[in-house]
């Protein structure tokens, strides 16, 4: 029985091994073809096979089920996460935001800053829709915030947080802008500046100038705002803006309204707006007037309103300087200027009066001399010319009829304007002369009149003008030889010269001095006829002009000194002293 049982058991083991081998072969064949159906069939069949025998097939199959079921379950769990990656995005509408904030958020630099700080990508989408504009089927302007896989954000939670942080930053910027606007309006902490740039010409309403100014998709206005940071809005007739059409702006011409808190940004925006308006006017073939010249023009400087800058002040300065440098003012009446023109000129010593000669002023250019210290009046004459040549030159230049045209008022004003202190000042400054014969009234040659004339010329600079008019100067005081015959006009009848019977030859009856003194070489004084001045000078020099008759005993002494006088002429030391 035991053998039979053994024989019976052998076929059972053989059959089990054959069944296992066939099952493994079948499983290997069908695993790659239909894995889902095989697993379902195996999951149902394996529980029935477990109680059949205590073999190792069951433990070997359970890990297989686990290994095969895990890869199939993972795709089912990850499938909704892949769909969430596409949905992780947010949109923030900025179409109704303030213009400056709207353009700040749409700038590429602002969006790049948000991306660097949060990791989310911000993209501008939609189209700007003006207020109260009819819908056109497109979304209004908004920001699309997303977190893409290329940003190295592996987990979904990190991407969601990045999008939330970016949206929070944008919302915070919008809140701060609204708060700043409220503060600027209520508390006036920020002073808003605004200006207008007008089109400058009337365009045809059918030409749609407003669209040309805005540009395609408002690119021109956006460019100005992006470059300067100022707010630019198109307003006025034909602008298409419905915000303030009921107000005063609806009646204004077409213009760009520039506003901002920074003066520099306003200036830059105005410059760009002017260039834009100029370009539009060229396209329409119209001549445009700049906004600064017509609307809201800046007033010109005060210098341009009052005339040339500082012209009156400069003229006053010139007049005052000229008055300081001029030694004597000219106060002659208007009708005296035509007959006797005298031009005041500057002098080296403005504290002394100008001594102007009528003869020189009529014969040649007038050259004033101040105080007897300047020799500019003798340019070209002194000291090359001899005394005789000097006298001849003066006689040629002197013209007596000129005085007849001068009115008496001018003579009186001129004579009174000459100070009497000049003669005394000159006498004090000059050293005393040495005279050979102190007891004689005249220490010169036999003709005492000539000597008296030379003394008068040396001691005083001012003489009566009437004396110059009546008789020309005598050359006797300049040269020892007798005077030329050509310079001896008849003496004046109104004069009373002090003559002596013993004096030979008689000098010309004149009280005038020599026009050119060899001592100081001064220009001759003006020839004015004034009896009051003549009488005053006669009183001052009574001892010189009216000497007592010379007795005969003194004539011999005078003849005795003729020889020595020829050698020692009193005029010589005066010339060397000057």
UniProtKB/Swiss-Prot annotation:
Region (Disordered): 1-34, 413-578
GO molecular function: RNA binding
InterPro entries: KH_1_KHDC4/BBP-like, KH_dom_type_1_sf, PRP5/DDX46/KHDC4_KH, RIK/BLOM7
Domain of life from the UniProt record: Eukaryota
Domain (KH): residue spans on this chain: 206-273
Keyword annotations: Nucleus, RNA-binding
Summary of the tissues where the protein is detected: Expressed in vegetative tissues.
First-listed, main subcellular location of the protein, grouped into a coarse class: nucleus
Pfam families on file: KH-I_KHDC4-BBP, KH_12
An example Gene Ontology CC term for this record: nucleus
Feature: compositional bias, Pro residues: 472-492
Subcellular location: Nucleus
Biased composition range(s): Low complexity: 493-503, 510-521
Biased composition (Polar residues): 413-425
Subunit structure: Interacts with AS1.
Name of this protein: Protein RIK
Gene field: RIK
